């Protein structure tokens, strides 16, 4: 049987060695393989080499890959493709299958690495450790051209077996090296007696280790020292506490801390957090509360209950004696005002006094009895009422001096007659007596300005410097004026309690400042209640004021309309018209404007609750321009705008503009002005004429007589009530020329010429006793007096002027 097999083997070998006479080409082979695959004879995938001349199965490719890995331990996939001669794509795909099915292999960055390779590396590392005691994982990773994490992951399961070392902070250390460093850490830690940060301890240890290892030594990471320290602490080879992983407090220091705190607290009954910080205790409140459960934590100190009892006794005495106490004065200097305030709230006597409203805490540390505060407040309240009244009345107009100035040019004999006549013809009298030249006519305004210059120079400078700036409303100023300022309140408190002056007014924490802040709202409420009461009382007075103002304006405004009509006669003579317009604005118009502005100002003050004396509402007031402007600004809203327009018109040159603004202001104020109709005009003219006739009949001053005669002639001839100043008398006489006969006109012109001459002599006179002009003045006056009867006959005699 064996012989037969050997024979068959020889025949098969011969058949293989015999060269066939018919050979298949490469193309025929490829087509044959494809045909076999189509027929299903070959039912598995075939891969061809990169040369295309050989076929290889996937299983054979995996076997080739496994063989290379077993031989080399670590092989690159790219190198496998070159070695096996198969396309890289197929090699990568089969390599992944190989690694997936073999847990001992890993595919890392295009390389297949076996566990046997790592075992050999571990043995090499162990040999190197025996030489240098420590190796950095990063150094190994650089040599192996892999990541440090991979090296660390493969070394960790081999530590203590293949690798006789300890891995700490990316470093491999031998057991002997670890023991040596452990001894260093133990010795250094036991030598610390105060709280320390361990990171500061590791720096000198690193230097010591490097000096021990020489130039070949590698720097030791702090984490290695820290892990050794943590292990020693866990094994209780060191006593103390570790906080936040790095802050080490030895037990000896903690014991000394507690003894020091106990000693200070038992002696003083308090301990400050600052001293706790100096002792190295950062969380002082928690430490003290855990050690002294009966104590009380404050803002800056921790106290024993005996401190509260001591303060309670002192404050109780102050409250019972109707006095005050600064709690900080009985407490140590380390206590703050917040500490004092919290202690006061814990005092039983203070709690009961606050509940019964017998005491008050001001500024956190001051305790004042209610009786003490009331005594001071009652006195200040009385003075605050006086201050409010004085401040509210300070802005009212005092017209006495103004009235005397404005009436200087009215002769004494104009006071004769009834009060009713005075009221009707006040403006007429003021105008008709002005038979003086231009210089004398302007004497009154100039003197008023001169008197005001010295009195208001400083305020004028302030107004000039602030021109164009935004003004604070007068109403707000008046409201603020009646409220006493803080300085005033503090001064009154010092007057009542002189000892408060030692604290000073500038110190924001002084009892003086706190007491003033406490009393200020009370004073404001008191003053508001007073103003409310005054406002209620002012309601009837306001109605009476408006009624009186209406009556005054009714007659005055009708007279103003009457005088305005006479101006139409001089529209063709512009120079004279300007003089007449200005004269009427400065006399009658100024009087009724001042009456209205003053009345509205008083009404506004009453409306705002300001107490106004009864006499102030009845006085006749004549104001200057600045006072009118101040009163106008003192009004509210649109009323103020219209009042300012009235003041501006009064300073202008046209009476008609003034009349428009006056009507607007009166209408805005709720006042009704009567319009001059024919009937009223006849009545007023008749009364005016009658009054002038009476004055002409009784006039003894030759200078004043001329103006009254001219005015009476205008009524008789033109049926107009003319108000003419001295410098317009000549123009008025010229206007009468065509209406008078020659003798009457000559009488007027001669008398007017003599009057001007007399006034010129009087103006040039020095006033000395031996002045030679005195005789000339006397002679000229006697001449005028002799012509007075003839002048009167023009309006009173039998020969009346002829009307055309």
Swiss-Prot record:
**Compositional bias annotation for Low complexity:** 400-409
Keywords for this entry?
Acetylation, Transferase, Ubl conjugation pathway
Protein origin, superkingdom? Eukaryota
Any one Pfam family here would be E3_UFM1_ligase
The molecular function terms of the Gene Ontology recorded here are: UFM1 ligase activity
* Family, similarity comment: Belongs to the UFL1 family.
Could you identify this protein by its name? E3 UFM1-protein ligase 1 homolog
Native organism: Arabidopsis thaliana (Mouse-ear cress)
């Amino acid at each position: 049987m064996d012989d037969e097999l050997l024979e068959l083997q020889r025949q098969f070998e011969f058949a293989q060695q015999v060269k066939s006479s018919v050979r298949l080409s490469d193309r025929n082979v490829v087509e044959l393989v494809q045909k076999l695959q189509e027929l299903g004879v070959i039912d598995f995938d075939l891969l061809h080499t990169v040369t295309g001349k050989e076929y290889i199965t996937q299983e054979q490719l995996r076997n080739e890959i496994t063989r290379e890995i077993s031989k080399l331990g670590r092989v690159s996939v790219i190198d496998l493709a070159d070695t096996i001669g198969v396309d890289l794509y197929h090699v990568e795909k089969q390599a992944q299958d190989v690694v997936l099915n073999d847990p001992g292999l890993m595919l890392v960055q295009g390389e297949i690495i076996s566990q046997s390779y790592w075992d050999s590396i571990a043995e090499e590392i162990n040999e190197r450790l025996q030489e240098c005691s420590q190796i950095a994982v990063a150094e190994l990773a650089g040599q192996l051209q892999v990541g440090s994490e991979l090296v660390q992951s493969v070394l960790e399961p081999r530590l203590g077996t293949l690798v006789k070392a300890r891995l700490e902070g990316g470093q491999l250390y031998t057991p002997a090296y670890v023991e040596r460093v452990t001894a260093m850490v133990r010795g250094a830690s036991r030598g610390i007696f105060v709280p320390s940060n361990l990171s500061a301890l590791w720096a000198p240890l690193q230097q010591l280790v490097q000096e021990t290892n020489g130039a070949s030594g590698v720097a030791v990471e702090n984490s290695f020292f820290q892990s050794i320290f943590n292990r020693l602490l866990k094994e209780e080879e060191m006593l103390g506490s570790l906080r936040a992983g790095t802050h080490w407090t030895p037990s000896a220091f903690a014991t000394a801390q507690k003894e020091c705190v106990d000693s200070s607290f038992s002696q003083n009954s308090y301990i400050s957090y600052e001293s706790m910080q100096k002792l190295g205790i950062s969380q002082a409140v928690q430490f003290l509360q855990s050690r002294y459960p009966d104590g009380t934590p404050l803002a800056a100190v921790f106290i024993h209950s005996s401190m509260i009892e001591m303060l309670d006794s002192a404050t109780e005495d102050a409250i019972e004696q109707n006095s005050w106490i600064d709690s900080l004065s009985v407490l140590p200097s380390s206590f703050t005002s917040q500490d004092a305030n919290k202690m006061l709230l814990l005092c039983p006597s203070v709690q009961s006094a606050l509940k019964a409203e017998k005491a008050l805490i001001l500024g956190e540390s001051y305790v004042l009895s209610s009786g003490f505060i009331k005594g001071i407040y009652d006195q200040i309240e009385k003075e605050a009422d006086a201050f409010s009244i004085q401040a509210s009345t300070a802005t009212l107009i005092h017209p006495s001096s103004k009235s005397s100035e404005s009436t200087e040019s009215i002769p004494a004999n104009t006071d004769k007659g009834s009060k009713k006549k005075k009221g009707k013809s006040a403006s007429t009298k003021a105008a008709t007596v002005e038979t003086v030249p231009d210089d004398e006519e302007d004497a009154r305004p100039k003197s008023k300005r001169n008197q005001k210059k010295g009195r208001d120079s400083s305020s004028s400078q302030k107004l000039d410097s602030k021109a164009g700036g935004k003004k604070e409303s007068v109403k707000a100023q008046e409201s603020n004026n009646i409220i006493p300022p803080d300085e005033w309140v503090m001064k009154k408190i010092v007057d009542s309690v002189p000892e408060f002056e030692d604290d000073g007014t500038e110190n924001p924490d002084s009892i003086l400042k706190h007491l003033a802040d406490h009393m200020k709202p009370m004073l404001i409420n008191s003053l508001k209640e007073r103003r409310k009461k005054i406002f209620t009382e002012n309601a009837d007075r306001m109605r009476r004021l408006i009624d009186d103002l209406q009556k005054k304006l009714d007659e005055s405004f009708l007279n103003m309309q009457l005088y305005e009509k006479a101006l139409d006669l001089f529209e063709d003579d512009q120079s004279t018209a300007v003089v007449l317009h200005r004269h009427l604005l400065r006399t009658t118009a100024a009087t009724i404007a001042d009456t209205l502005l003053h009345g509205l100002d008083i009404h506004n003050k009453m409306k705002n609750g300001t107490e106004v004396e009864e006499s102030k509402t009845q006085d006749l007031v004549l104001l200057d321009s600045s006072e009118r402007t101040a009163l106008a600004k003192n009004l509210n809203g649109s009323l103020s705008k219209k009042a300012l327009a009235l003041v501006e018109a009064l300073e202008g040159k046209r009476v008609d503009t003034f009349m428009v603004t006056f009507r607007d202001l009166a209408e805005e104020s709720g006042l009704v002005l009567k319009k001059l109709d024919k009937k009223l005009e006849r009545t007023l003219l008749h009364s005016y004429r009658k009054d002038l006739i009476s004055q002409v009949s009784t006039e003894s001053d030759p200078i004043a007589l001329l103006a009254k005669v001219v005015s009476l002639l205008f009524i008789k001839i033109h049926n107009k009530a003319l108000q003419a100043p001295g410098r317009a008398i000549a123009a008025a006489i010229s206007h009468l020329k065509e209406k008078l006969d020659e003798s009457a006109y000559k009488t007027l012109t001669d008398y007017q010429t003599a009057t001007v001459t007399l006034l010129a002599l009087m103006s040039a006179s020095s006033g000395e006793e031996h002045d030679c002009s005195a005789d000339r003045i006397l002679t000229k006056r006697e001449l005028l007096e002799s012509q007075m009867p003839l002048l009167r006959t023009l309006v009173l005699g039998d020969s009346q002027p002829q009307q055309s």
